[in-house]
């Protein structure tokens, strides 16, 4: 269920965020009616609240609270498939898990190092990410997905290796916060492709062999600590298709 269009964040690689402005939000009333109709006519029991960054909706807390109350005691679950690291909080986590069904949570730091995140204008700190995943883990989630990009402008090997270090820190923080070793995260890597109408539209792409080299380095770095590496899933696209 699309709850709004547009984005004001201005990530330099994101075409959708540039060409779908201005932000246009659906009201809580409209969303509630569309959810009711969708559940009635589709037969599905999971409601995904979609947008470029669903937690940025100005009424997302009240929206999730209202839907959670409306479908309390049923098998209907709520999810936010696309969530900004700095917009997710404990209140939102509690609303999403009210019925006891915790669907997937995906966060997109995009870059492994703070330097590369500044380059792409993704102003998310490591502290923000750790605090966010700890909030998820302590509210009952046992797995989160982290999305990154490889081949970004000015990227070096070290920027990619920082993805592995960040994933290790996520697992360590989750285990420390919950006292459980049943904590997992999936690292998903997509290749950077310049898009028209973005600040990076004329940026060159790295050669496929460079991308593949960095993906191999990342896999080795994730598995360099076997205790942590076993808790981290790793998904990526080869350099050539990108």
List the model feature ranges, each with a label.
Residues 1-12, 39, 80-81, 104, ...:
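N-terminal pre-triad scaffold of radical SAM enzymes
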Residues 18-20, 119-124, 201-207:
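Short glycine-enriched, charge-decorated loop/helix-capping segments at active-site entrances
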Residues 36-186:
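Conserved SAM/AdoMet-binding glycine-rich loop
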Residues 17-21, 112-114, 151-152, 194-197:
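A short, flexible beta-alpha/helix-coil linker loop
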Residues 40, 137, 160-242:
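Auxiliary Fe-S-binding modules of radical SAM enzymes
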Residues 1-29:
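Canonical Radical SAM [4Fe-4S] cluster-binding loop centered on the CxxxCxxC motif
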Residues 27, 125, 156-159, 207-211:
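Residue-level preference for long, well-ordered alpha-helices that form the structural scaffold
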């Amino acid at each position: 269920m699309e709850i709004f269009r547009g984005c004001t964040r201005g990530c330099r690689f994101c075409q959708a965020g540039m060409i779908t402005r201005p932000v246009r939000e659906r009201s809580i009333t409209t969303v509630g009616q569309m959810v009711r109709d969708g559940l009635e006519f589709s037969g599905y029991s999971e409601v995904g609240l979609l947008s470029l960054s669903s937690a940025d909706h100005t009424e997302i807390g009240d929206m999730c609270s209202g839907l959670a109350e409306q479908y309390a005691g049923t098998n209907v679950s709520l999810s936010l498939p696309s969530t900004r690291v700095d917009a997710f909080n404990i209140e939102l986590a509690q609303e999403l898990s009210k019925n006891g069904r915790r669907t997937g949570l995906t966060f997109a730091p995009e870059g492994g190092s703070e330097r590369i995140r500044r380059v792409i204008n993704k102003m998310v700190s490591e502290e923000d990410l750790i605090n966010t995943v700890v909030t998820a883990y302590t509210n009952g989630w046992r797995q989160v997905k982290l999305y990154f990009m490889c081949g970004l402008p000015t990227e070096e090997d070290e920027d990619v290796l920082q993805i592995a270090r960040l994933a290790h820190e996520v697992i360590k923080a989750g285990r420390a916060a919950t006292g459980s070793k049943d904590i997992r995260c999936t690292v998903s890597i997509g290749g950077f492709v310049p898009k028209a109408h973005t600040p990076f539209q004329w940026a060159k792409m790295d050669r496929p062999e460079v991308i593949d080299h960095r993906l191999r380095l990342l896999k080795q770095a994730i598995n360099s600590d076997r205790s942590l590496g076993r808790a981290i899933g790793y998904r990526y696209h080869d350099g050539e298709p990108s």
